[in-house]
Structures are given as C-alpha cells and as structure tokens.
Amino acid sequence: QKPALLTTTLWDFPSQQYGDETQGDKNYRGATPAYIIRNLLHRYTRPKELVVDPMAGSGTTLDVARELNRRALGYDVNVTRKDIFHCDARKLPLEDEKAAFVFLDPPYSTHVHYSDDPRCIGKLSALTPDYYKAMELVLDEVKRILRPGRHMALYVSDSFQKGKPFCPIGFELFQRLSRRFEPVDIICVTRRNTTLDKGNYHKAAVEGNYFLRGFNYLFIMKKA
C-alpha cells in the first residue's frame, strides 16, 4: 500500500523508504526520505514529465520518479550508480527550461564526507561565504533549467557543531531562493536518524546546553 499524501506543513515519516520496492540506498549517509519525493512529485508533476536532481546522491529521486512514471535525470560529483551522471551541480549539461521539477538536497556544510572530488560543496563550511557562493551558482542553474511556472524544492538543515557558531543555513538559503523564485510554502520535516536515538547525545546536549537538529526545512518554490 502506497503512503497517503500529506496535507499539513509538518511531515513525519516512519522510515527512509516505503513499500516493498527500494528507493535509493537506505544506508547512504544523508539519504533523502523517499516519502518527501513522492509527495512533491504527486503535487507538482504529471506522468512523462522530466524531473531533475542535480545532487542525486544514492538516486532516491530517480527511483521515485520512475515509479510514478516520470522521466528523471540525476547528477552528482560522487556517482553511486550507472544512471547518475558525473557532473558539478553548478554547471549542468542540460538545455534551458527543460525540467518540469527540480529537487535539491545539498550538503549541510561539512558534516558528511561525500566525495574526494575538490568540486564537492560538502567540503565547504557554512561558516564561510564560499558555501553560499557555491549554492548561489547551483540555484542559478536550477532556475535556468526549470520551465516557467513550474516548481522546485530544496531540503536542508541548519548546522551546529559543538564549540562552533550556529549556522542558520535554512534562512540563508531561503533568502537566496527568494531572489530567484516565488515562495510557495515551507514544510518542516522531522529528522529521524540513529544520532537522535542515542541517549548519550541527548545527555551531552543537556550538559552542554545546546540542541540537536530535530527537523529539516523543505522549501517549495515556483519559477515565475
């Protein structure tokens, strides 16, 4: 049985994947919950339309799109499977206004080592302007390839590392998105990962007087 579409701006999923099929790789660090892609594509695309993921990771977007009879293209500097093209999201090999929908799940600063490729944005700290400059180039490419009147979504978390300043990545990227697209809505997605299940992490957060990341932003935007 397929999951029902969600109708509020608070999304909480029991797992990374749904059903008996595999969407992406559940063991891939930072894998996007397949439920998110399913909800977005049901709302903002139609069968046979082209869905693009410039930071495809383990291919969750591609699998969900094809399951829903959408065409899909995925790009990444760290290729994990044959149907993902080796490419920097700042320079996509796609013609203008070809995509009906674009999904982005970028690195949230330097928390996860994704690749040894020097072009990997995950090597850039969100404490520096370089991260945001790189993401602006990615957003420019998304705007270029997206058809007018169609939607894109960006899934991201803020960043906090003990002993370092808090990085409001979500707010920073939303400002940059708003200069390129029309805001449609903001969804709060509950984070479910092994870190949040470990009691010692919660004990450390209390003792250190800081908070663990409990949610991700899902920004939904429209190209004028």
Positions of PLM-derived features:
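Class I S-adenosyl-L-methionine-dependent methyltransferase catalytic core
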Residues: 1-224
